[in-house]
Curated annotation (Swiss-Prot):
It is found in: Cell inner membrane. GO terms for cellular component: photosystem II; plasma membrane. One of its GO terms (biological process) is photosynthesis. Belongs to the PsbU family. Transmembrane segments: none annotated. This is Photosystem II extrinsic protein U.
Amino acid sequence: MQEHIRKISALVLSGAVCMGMGTAVLAQSSPSPSGTYQPGDKTNQVPPTTTTPEPGPAGTPPSPSSPYGAPAQPSTTPPSSTSPSTTPAPTARTIDLNAVTSAQLVRAGLDEPSAKLIEQNQPYTKPEDVLQVQGLSEQTKAALKANMDILRANPKMK
């Protein structure tokens, strides 16, 4: 019975870690809520959408004056003649393994024991070093591997 409970707990925990890390990745790839757009800015682009015309009453085709009957017009905005901005694009949210606290790791989706182990083994010289921490479960290591692109190991400033 206890073994069954342990297996279920491990499954739920790994699902929570994966869900938390997936949520963090999605939050980073989402456009900012401010909704501001600057010409040439590719961080807040909205993918083009198309609408299917809805038939009128009794299956008649929609009239051209109907908002659903007008064919979709592609945007013909001319390309900007100015050079792209020289300021770097805002970077996605990253996690500095040498500055992160266990509470921040828990909020990112890790379980508390794994988060404490990661914090106790600081400093790291490169992000891959976190995978060598003794005591991390395979599920936690898999979640960390899947999110290696957002992990950093910046040297601690004194």
